[in-house]
């Protein structure tokens, strides 16, 4: 049986990937109720953006794939580096330093815990043969 995964992607988010990964690591593997609570009370700049992305993935799962909301959990979430905007910062004697304004691509995948149970049962039955 093929597992159904709901996916949401936020591209070109103006948060450095290093800072976004701190928040993403908190919710990986959690069920959606726990993840929403964690993101609501996390005092980081990336938390509201990731919460909005989580809510989008939940809507995709419930409306498009008809998955049960109570059984959803965060299967995988990762942050990739996006574009780097290069800006000049003026320094002494007419010189300048480069400032790299970093962006992120955040990907969040959620699935139902019943999908996890059925895939584990298939693996166990396949290994016995």
UniProtKB/Swiss-Prot annotation:
Keyword vocabulary terms for this entry: Ribonucleoprotein, Ribosomal protein, RNA-binding, rRNA-binding
Gene Ontology process terms (BP): translation
GO cellular component labels: cytosolic large ribosomal subunit
SUPFAM superfamilies in alphabetical order: Ribosomal protein L22
CDD domains: Ribosomal_L22
Cystine bridges: none
Keyword Ribonucleoprotein (UniProt): yes
One Gene Ontology molecular-function label: structural constituent of ribosome
PROSITE patterns recorded: RIBOSOMAL_L22 (PS00464)
The UniProt record lists the keyword Acetylation: no
Annotated function: This protein binds specifically to 23S rRNA; its binding is stimulated by other ribosomal proteins, e.g. L4, L17, and L20. It is important during the early stages of 50S assembly. It makes multiple contacts with different domains of the 23S rRNA in the assembled 50S subunit and ribosome.
Subunit structure: Part of the 50S ribosomal subunit.
Protein family (similarity comment): Belongs to the universal ribosomal protein uL22 family.
UniProt name for this protein: Large ribosomal subunit protein uL22
Lineage: Bacteria, Bacillati, Mycoplasmatota, Mollicutes, Acholeplasmatales
Gene expressing this chain: rplV
